[in-house]
Amino acid sequence: MTLAIIGGGPAGYAAAVSAAQQGRNVLLIDKGKLGGTCLNEGCIPTKSLLESANVLDKIKHADSFGIELPAGAISVDWSKMQSRKQQVVSQLVQGVQYLMKKNQIQVVKGTASFLSERKLLIEGENGKEIREADQVLIASGSEPIELPFAPFDGEWILDSKDALSLSEIPSSLVIVGGGVIGCEYAGLFARLGSQVTIIETADRLIPAEDEDIARLFQEKLEEDGVEVHTSSRLGRVDQTAKTAIWKSGQREFKTKADYVLVAIGRKPRLDGLQLEQAGVDFSPKGIPVNGHMQTNVPHIYACGDAIGGIQLAHAAFHEGIIAASHASGRDVKINEKHVPRCIYTSPEIACIGMTERQARSIYGDVKIGEFSFSANGKALIKQQAEGKVKIMAEPEFGEIVGVSMIGPDVTELIGQAAAIMNGEMTADMAEHFIAAHPTLSETLHEALLSTIGLAVHA
């Protein structure tokens, strides 16, 4: 039996490998480079540039560690940062290509559209061909949302991909949208010397996350020189004058900038698939699926950004594997109750489960445990003692229902929180944990103990 997969991003290639491992004949169709947006235009290249900015931060504070540098010794070579970024991306793309070869997955470069429930029209480098498949998995990914009055032009009005490959570091940048993508780019370019302005419609940055965490992050971002305007909206742009015109309340403001980066979210990429030819239900929000990742047509599956919902690469990996396993005859269902959410800013932010507001709306008087990085030995050693770990536990049994962190390397700590929550552990079980010392993970341990009033160093 043949499984055809449309899209070679995290959901698509993970599904391809998983299905092949389970003995399936797999055909993968993708028009671009394997790895999708995440590997080529998103997660990996942005984090590569952000890591360069992190190194710059450390060098700037070298004197506080007893290391003195000659005056004027620090400089930023944007082209070398770009080269390093591309080296990382290329190595990982080659890794995905190796996985395809190792697992004997047929990869066709091109686009695919449905002719019927099982027939696909593939248009690629070798022209057009029609292929039949017993099952089809749609993993077509997503694309940036445009503002109707300010469409992307790749020259002044940028999407996130455009911002990755600028020829030089901008002296000024307006970012429309204070979510994950907007805040990561704001932190990157501000630390590289750009004057950055964020315009966000909500009353705070990263509005989907815990209010305490968002407040601490905004304070740090403003300390780094970023101009933040919440409860504000971009109204129009003057491309000739390179000016963004925006409103806050009834007042109108103008901000001149080298570029405008629009980061107001992403939408499922479904155009051109001809889903109606296969009878697959869909909407602008994505393709509805059940717990097995099946669409309304049982032998057609969908996962990743194409279904809307959680637009995260690690969720897409998981969804792809579940879809492949179910298509291969295993009775498996998705569980996305505890998906980590990471923001690679400075300091980093990592969350899982509910925010405090969400927890209180369900459980009422929840137990809150907190521990500050300023009381953690490893954080002080690293001279990165800003931030805290915050834990929400439901009141009856003490089960952990949410964890929010802001601080050094918290994206590496959130996996421990995920294990705790997936194991349905309660806060009092923390008494039996032993966290290595000195490590940042002690903050999570102490925050757990704090929910039952037993934190030692608080």
From Swiss-Prot:
The entry marks the following residues as binding NAD(+), namely 177-181, 200, 263-266
Q: Does the keyword Plastid apply?
A: no
The note on the cofactor says:
Binds 1 FAD per subunit.
* Obligatory cofactor(s): FAD
Oxidoreductase found in the keyword field: yes
Q: Which family does it belong to?
A: Belongs to the class-I pyridine nucleotide-disulfide oxidoreductase family.
* Subunit architecture: Homodimer.
Pfam families (alphabetical): Pyr_redox_2, Pyr_redox_dim
A GO cellular component annotation here is: cytoplasm
In which pathway is this protein known to take part? Answer: Ketone degradation; acetoin degradation
- The entry's protein name is Dihydrolipoyl dehydrogenase
Query: Which domain of life, per UniProt?
Result: Bacteria
Q: Any further remarks?
A: The active site is a redox-active disulfide bond.
Q: Which InterPro entries match?
A: Class-I_Pyr_Nuc-Dis_Oxidored (IPR050151), FAD/NAD-bd_sf (IPR036188), FAD/NAD-binding_dom (IPR023753), FAD/NAD-linked_Rdtase_dimer_sf (IPR016156), Lipoamide_DH (IPR006258), Pyr_nuc-diS_OxRdtase (IPR001100), Pyr_nucl-diS_OxRdtase_dimer (IPR004099), Pyr_OxRdtase_I_AS (IPR012999)
In the UniProt record, what gene is named as encoding this protein?
Answer: acoL
The family database entries (PROSITE patterns) matched by this protein are listed as: PYRIDINE_REDOX_1
- The chain's disulfide connectivity reads 38-43
Q: List the active-site residues.
A: 437
Name where it's found: Cytoplasm
Q: What organism does this protein naturally occur in?
A: Bacillus subtilis (strain 168)
Q: Which reaction does it catalyse?
A: N(6)-[(R)-dihydrolipoyl]-L-lysyl-[protein] + NAD(+) = N(6)-[(R)-lipoyl]-L-lysyl-[protein] + NADH + H(+)
Its GO biological process annotations read: 2-oxoglutarate metabolic process; acetoin catabolic process; pyruvate metabolic process
Q: Which UniProt keywords apply?
A: Acetoin catabolism, Cytoplasm, Disulfide bond, FAD, Flavoprotein, NAD, Oxidoreductase, Redox-active center
Molecular function, one GO term: flavin adenine dinucleotide binding
Residues given in the record as FAD binding sites: 30-38, 47, 112, 305, 313
